[in-house]
């Protein structure tokens, strides 16, 4: 069995890890970094840039540089959270035919899983470059509070990237695996507080250690899938925009280039204020009016930032209370608090969490890497490389169906350990009813329409009977990824209908296959582009070398020979401007053949120079020899 890699597909940054022997290892990407910005850019030349290269060009290409796509994955366009993002994102979020939130990039409609797949492809290539082998399987993490649609969309992204997603696991659970794997013996109850770039989760996890076999059991989970570092950045950006407007009377919101510069500066300032009390946001030539260029220079203190985001930090505290209550525990029952996600580096976040739990969070867990490490551990468990670890995760939200009167009747309650299966018998609501519609819901509200609709299907062919007579058995089956399978069966006729919830918001099989094919085609195009660049570099180096040799030896080359070499140089230079790899290779070979005499002369000259240097150094050695006269002294004893 090949390696199963662990991927933390984050809102702001992503990370990939593997099991190296019995130890997890976080891998460095092609830029030499252990985390990769979850940023994808589509350039004018048709290139797709991922990570740091995409981030670097964001200022000049804001509308086609996509970030925080995880906030849109598995979501409907009409969702309140999406409507909020439309107002602040520089790129265009549109309504797709099935009601999903999609993105318009250069007049091409793209689904969030298709865009996220580009980040996963980079993670896959990072692992392949390190291992020197093809990678086909992965464990991918998601926020614990992701619903069925968001989990399914994440699996779709994996498939589009050419990965078989062996398991979807919750981010806090993965962090607990990373934390608990090398800890000493003994049972512990931990709280994992995960505040990332776009999502927030809290999980209460019990680690049982019996005869060196560790069981990680999630007791409860809660969270907010639209709360994270991006929201903190937005608050600071808004403040800077308002301050600049007060000073200069210009609203920067109308300038996408200025807003992209401001976004980068705000993120940098926020990070600096985790260690400094004050920082300057200094952006010269941010914009201009009829009076000339304008510069932005605003001082921001840590206390100012804290006042801007305090309500966001407090929004994370309520889920902590709910999770503890659901787990049947009090604050005193928690042995350790683990902080995960880059936003937890903010001192205010750390102090509020410490105040709530009455203890300082642990500092020995890397908040940026723990989730990927845990995913790699789970990959090791699935491949058999890691023994004595059992993971018992939960479903974050209740699952049920709509029943008479528009009520949601739960079949599986939130925080139920998965995989799980539950059946319940329902009956018809009207006389002689020949069909029933099973409307599947996810959420905690009593009124059906207040919950997330996951999909619906019909069970036809029910024998006519008085109301309440027919018996319809509905079964909910959740697999290890938290994906739901539903069946409905007429107990009298044995007629059955099944559905795997693909979510009412989601990609159909045809769309996924098309995106997989597109990704494979792009992969081939990427490979060809890389080869073209390598050949161009070879050509450039050869031109530089031959020109240098010509300058040094032009008096020793016949005029006719010289013209041939210059013509071949011009031909190669011309082809380097084009896209034809085979033509460049042909011209490289042609120049090598024509300039062979020049190369011989140059080599001969180099050899002669070396001989001269050797002779010169020998004579210098001789100069340093001191002549001395020796007198033989005879030993009188002999």
From Swiss-Prot:
The gene is dnaK. Gene3D superfamilies: 1.20.1270.10, 3.30.420.40, Actin, Chain A, domain 4 (3.90.640.10), Substrate Binding Domain Of DNAk, Chain A, domain 1 (2.60.34.10). GO terms for molecular function: ATP binding; ATP-dependent protein folding chaperone; unfolded protein binding. The modification Phosphothreonine is found at residue 199. This is Chaperone protein DnaK. Belongs to the heat shock protein 70 family. CDD domains: ASKHA_NBD_HSP70_DnaK-like. Induction: By stress conditions e.g. heat shock. It comes from Buchnera aphidicola subsp. Schizaphis graminum (strain Sg). InterPro entries: ATPase_NBD, Chaperone_DnaK, Heat_shock_70_CS, HSP70_C_sf, HSP70_peptide-bd_sf, Hsp_70_fam. Residues 600-638 are annotated as: Disordered. Disulfide bonds: none annotated.
